């Protein structure tokens, strides 16, 4: 019964954090790693493919260089933000498929070919802002603990609101992919020096205590330590030459 109740709370929580007037909240994302010695060929083929089949006003694709983490040296691709229905309605042309198979796929290592879907949680995010450089923090949580983790996220956001923090962040939930028990913090940064503001997820307990009090801060940190199994962080940098123009502000 307890598990049923927790599952119900989790589903309701996702509905609440995902609901907004604009239903374009879904990102499709993937990694693309060049085969040894084939980086130039991959990037040339991808640039040509995006220009031909993902231009402004068409199905958008954005690519980023991965600068840190286990996938450093790869490209990180995104399509979106979309409504779920857009994936049902999309029909790829045969020319699109053939061009990709001929000029992109032969130069890409397929060992890391998972495709994930992320959903933006606006009610858990704080002052989202566009950038061309991002710091991602992946929180891998215990299965079935989403409701508790959402409670932590709500408290953390409240602390930032009360302190009028200058560090903005977006929250995404992985709803399908390699690890569906993943929540992603997305920090926009202007330069590497700004990493200092996005590397204190729970280490910023002092600022939380000043706004929420010692007791509530301790409770939230205990939730975090209980439900988060591990983390991974990566820095990504926008590649306009490999991306659909005019969609970065989304």
Whereabouts are the PLM-identified features?
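Bacterial Sec-dependent N-terminal signal peptides
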Residues: 1-24
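Short S/T/G/P-rich N-terminal loop/turn motif that feeds into the first structured element of a domain
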Residues: 19-250
């Amino acid at each position: 019964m307890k598990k049923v109740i927790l599952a119900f709370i989790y589903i309701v929580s996702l509905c609440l954090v995902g609901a907004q007037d604009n239903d374009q909240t879904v990102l499709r994302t993937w990694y693309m790693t060049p085969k040894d010695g084939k980086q130039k060929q991959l990037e040339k083929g991808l640039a040509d493919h995006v220009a031909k089949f993902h231009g402004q006003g068409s199905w958008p694709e954005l690519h980023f260089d991965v600068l840190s983490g286990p996938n450093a040296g790869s490209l990180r691709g995104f399509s979106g933000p979309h409504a779920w229905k857009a994936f049902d309605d999309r029909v790829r042309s045969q020319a699109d498929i053939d061009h990709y198979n001929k000029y992109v796929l032969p130069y890409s290592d397929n060992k890391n070919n998972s495709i994930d879907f992320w959903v933006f949680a606006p009610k858990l995010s704080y002052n989202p802002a566009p950038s061309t450089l991002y710091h991602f923090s992946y929180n891998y949580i215990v299965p079935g603990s989403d409701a508790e983790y959402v409670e932590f996220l709500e408290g953390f956001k409240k602390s930032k609101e009360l302190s009028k923090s200058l560090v903005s962040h977006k929250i995404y939930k992985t709803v399908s992919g390699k690890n569906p028990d993943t929540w992603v913090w997305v920090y926009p940064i202007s330069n590497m020096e700004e990493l200092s503001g996005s590397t204190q997820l729970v280490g910023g307990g002092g600022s939380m205590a000043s706004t929420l009090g010692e007791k509530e801060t301790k409770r939230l940190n205990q939730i975090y330590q209980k439900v988060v199994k591990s983390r991974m962080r990566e820095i990504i940098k926008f590649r306009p030459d490999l991306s659909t123009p005019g969609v970065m502000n989304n």
